[in-house]
Amino acid sequence: VTQICNLKCHYCAAGGDGTYGDPVTRISIEKTLPQLKFFIEQLKENQKFTISFVGGEPLLYPEAVKSIYDYVVSLQAEKKFSPQFSLVTNATLITDRVRDILKTMKIHIAVSLDGSAHINDIARPTKDGTSSTALTLQGVQQLKKIHSDIGSFGISAVTTKDNLNIVDTYSFF
C-alpha cells in the first residue's frame, strides 16, 4: 500500500523511513485493481492465494487496504477462488476509524513489537525519537476489541541482540 512508515526503525532496510531514497508515497489504486483482476483471472477454480499488506506502514492508508480487499472479494462472484488477507502493522495508527474498517474484513494481522518498551524502543522509535511502544500497545488493545470480527492477530518480533533473552521477552508477551 505504501513504502512510507511513521516510525524510524534502526534495522529498516528501506532507510528508516521506507522510501529507499525514492519519492514514492503510496500505490495507485487505479493501477493496482486491474493488475489484481489480471492475476485472479489466471487462477484455477478454488485456488487459494494470499494478499499481504505490508509497508512501510499500510495503515497510513487504511482506505486503500479496504478498497483492495473489497475489490478482490467482489471478484469472487465472477470466479471461484479462495483469497486470504494478511496485514503487518506497527499498530500505532489503530484509531476507532481504522478499527471500524478492519472489523469489516476477514484478515490476519501481525503486529510488529520486539518486546517491552525498554527493548522495543531501542529499535522502533518514532520519527522524533520518542517511544512507540505505548502507541503500539494501545493499538493492540483496539485489536482485542475486534478479535472475533477479524481473522486473527498476533505479534511479530524481530530478534536482535537486545531481545535475545527469550524468557524476558516471553514474559512480556
What are these regions (language model features)?
Residues G55-G56:
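Short acidic donor-binding/metal-coordinating loop in glycosyltransferase active sites
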